[in-house]
């Protein structure tokens, strides 16, 4: 069962809390979980690090969680000092080993700026960046082959705590099948280049969401939100990215990204409530 507490006017489930001694999200909702990335610990049995970070001296270090199950900011700042920190790897907490990584410096998303942990609503955030000089945006790539972690063609559910940080960004993609294209000045109604999506595809902060165009995707998601997607993946495509990387299209800035295989509609609202219980988005 999920315990419920009250903080101010916000109901919080135990599965949404990150403090020690409380039930973690994937302890309650771990069935058919295929990938799980977060700035907090999601599963009690997970003993690995949160992410691997490169500092301004190009030294890489795995950063774990503190005693409360949150990203260890003390260790992170000791590593980065007064400089910047960039994400080399974001470790999968599902137990399946699907690390997201970026080994090239320029496309690495940022987590520390000038000795300060980047945050949104009080929680660390992996921040997307665009580099006009190289025509690149930041992105993280799932270690191939993708089918090891996302084995079947068909229905998947995606839960992401995220925001559009740059004027051009893409939530995720398979090869060139792009999902939720945010572009600040574009009136294109092509907000995804992927036909494999089901009815009622999107929910934003627990309610149905239908973007009008790419500019609408950018503006309506420019602050922290919980995006839920009921979609499909194709196991004939070997690549999977958070972000895109070319034509200045970066990753959406992100705090959490969780993927389930199969139909999770019966748990959808409960998972959203649990996630919101930790991040206090809406």
Question: Where are each of the predicted segments found?
Answer:
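Extracellular glycan-recognition modules
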Residues: 87-90, 94-197, 261-273
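Short polybasic amphipathic segments
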Residues: 49-53, 189-191, 200-203
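Extracellular, beta-strand-rich glycan-interacting domains
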Residues: 5, 41-56, 65, 89, ...
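Flexible glycan-contacting loops in extracellular carbohydrate-active proteins
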Residues: 189-191, 195, 221-253
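N-terminal amphipathic, basic-rich helices that act as targeting or association modules
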Residues: 18-101
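Enriched but not universal
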Residues: 1-45, 267-282
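Short amphipathic beta-strand/extended segments with alternating polar/hydrophobic composition
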Residues: 58-70, 141-144, 181-183, 198-215
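Short tryptophan-centered beta-strand motifs in secreted/extracellular beta-sheet-rich domains
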Residues: 157-159, 195-231
């Amino acid at each position: 069962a999920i315990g419920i507490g009250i903080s101010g006017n916000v109901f919080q489930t135990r599965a949404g809390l990150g403090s020690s001694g409380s039930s973690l999200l994937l302890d309650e909702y771990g069935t058919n979980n295929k990938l799980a990335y977060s700035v907090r610990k999601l599963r009690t049995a997970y003993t690995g690090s949160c992410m691997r970070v490169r500092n301004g001296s190009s030294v890489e270090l795995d950063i774990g969680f503190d005693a409360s199950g949150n990203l260890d900011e003390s260790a992170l700042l000791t590593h980065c000092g007064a400089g910047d920190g960039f994400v080399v790897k974001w470790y999968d907490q599902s137990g399946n080993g699907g690390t997201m990584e970026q080994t090239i410096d320029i496309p690495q998303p940022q987590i520390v700026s000038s000795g300060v942990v980047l945050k949104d609503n009080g929680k660390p955030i992996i921040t997307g960046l665009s580099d006009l000089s190289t025509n690149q945006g930041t992105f993280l790539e799932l270690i191939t082959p993708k089918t090891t972690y996302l084995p079947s063609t068909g229905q998947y559910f995606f839960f992401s705590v995220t925001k559009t940080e740059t004027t051009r960004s893409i939530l995720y993609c398979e090869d060139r099948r792009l999902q939720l294209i945010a572009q600040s000045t574009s009136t294109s109604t092509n907000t995804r280049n992927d036909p494999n999506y089901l009815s009622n595809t999107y929910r934003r902060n627990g309610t149905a969401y239908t973007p009008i165009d790419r500019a609408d995707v950018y503006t309506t998601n420019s602050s922290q939100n919980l995006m839920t997607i009921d979609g499909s993946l194709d196991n004939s495509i070997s690549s999977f990215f958070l972000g895109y990387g070319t034509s200045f299209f970066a990753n959406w800035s992100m705090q959490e990204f969780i993927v389930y295989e199969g139909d999770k509609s019966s748990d959808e609202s409960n998972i959203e409530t649990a996630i919101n219980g930790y991040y206090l988005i809406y």
